[in-house]
Amino acid sequence: MDAEGLSTDELFCFLQAKRNEDFSYSHILSSMCTTPHPVAVQAHNLFMETNLGDPGLFPGTATLEDRLIRWFADLYHEPSAGGCTTSGGTESNIQVLRFCKKTKNVKEPNIIVPASAHFSFEKACGMMDIEMRVVPVDEQYRMKTDAAGELIDKNTCCIVGVAGTTEYGMTDPIPALGKLAEQEGVHLHVDAAFGGYVLPFLDDAPPFDFSVPGVGSIAVDPHKMGLSTIPSGVLMVRDERVFCNLLVETPYLTTKQAYSLTGTRPGASVAAAYAVMAYLGRKGMKALVTGCMENTRRMIEGMEAFGVHRKVTPDVNVATFEHVSVPSPWVVSYTRKGDLRIVCMPHVTRDVVEAFLSDFGESYVSHIS
């Protein structure tokens, strides 16, 4: 830090220069985040200074969190479900493993996760000294239920299924995992950080929520397909009493106990998530998701017209193909197996899809000729 401060002109000239070094979403095809909706930005700015870590000081903001949780409870077919907002899927997954470990209360706990699980579970297990048992996926990149059953023992505290995998956009067989969880008396957590905003608005989507017996908790991220500001996550639980295992005393706050992982919790991102859902409604969300899925199908159709084959037909708006290079300035990613991965987020409009296909086609044809 310099002895003398900058003028606002100097400061923001520098900041704008740094921002200009960032990639533009107009060419980003790899991210599961997107440009937030204008109402999310407006709501975020309105609630910028609010802190839900001390909700008694911000009762209006706390009411928005309560309403958001009630909306997700209804969306996920369990009106009595409870929940709380988090910073995103990683925090939600950590919280689940915290209460699962405490509930099971064994010396050497383990969890069962698919090979497609998000890396946050590896982080969480390392933090809490939990063994992570990895289940292989089938040819459709879905968790093998039989293999999962073989790994369960008396120390298993949680089974994890994924709804909308990060790499291939697939959904694990949640009903089968629910039966397994009930049979073994183990908590089933569904990581729907991405798919939780997509699957409820699709016709004939694979079941993943509390309508499935055995599902105990669900993680979903408004800062992904919910068009909210970053960071924003929600953790839903079928039975809110599981949070009792996480309570700590907070004597100097307006509430005397808390179960959240973070102390300070931004009310701004909660207001942003609420604003988007209130503004779009179910019809608006369905239209948004439908558009993203149509663009995903167009992307697959266009790539296959060049002879680049899909790896799988996805459940959500993630398209994967055999390994090929992509021309600049397009930003894509590749799976652990080296497959090309493209996420058709709301900023990936039909015009963007067509522009990418045009650039790719020109580059690909010249490369193979």
UniProtKB/Swiss-Prot annotation:
Signal peptide: none annotated. Keywords: Decarboxylase, Lyase, Pyridoxal phosphate. The modification N6-(pyridoxal phosphate)lysine is found at residue 224. It holds the Pfam family Pyridoxal_deC. Its cofactor is pyridoxal 5'-phosphate. Its EC number is 4.1.1.11, 4.1.1.25. It is an enzyme of class 4 (lyase). GO terms for molecular function: aspartate 1-decarboxylase activity; pyridoxal phosphate binding; tyrosine decarboxylase activity. Pathway: Cofactor biosynthesis; methanofuran biosynthesis; Cofactor biosynthesis; coenzyme A biosynthesis. GO terms for biological process: carboxylic acid metabolic process; coenzyme A biosynthetic process; methanofuran biosynthetic process. The keyword Lyase applies. It catalyses: L-tyrosine + H(+) = tyramine + CO2; L-aspartate + H(+) = beta-alanine + CO2. Gene3D superfamilies: Aspartate Aminotransferase, domain 1, Type I PLP-dependent aspartate aminotransferase-like (Major domain). Catalyzes the decarboxylation of L-tyrosine to produce tyramine for methanofuran biosynthesis. Can also catalyze the decarboxylation of L-aspartate to produce beta-alanine for coenzyme A (CoA) biosynthesis. Belongs to the group II decarboxylase family. MfnA subfamily. This is Probable L-tyrosine/L-aspartate decarboxylase. It comes from Methanospirillum hungatei JF-1 (strain ATCC 27890 / DSM 864 / NBRC 100397 / JF-1). The lineage of its organism: Archaea, Methanobacteriati, Methanobacteriota, Stenosarchaea group, Methanomicrobia.
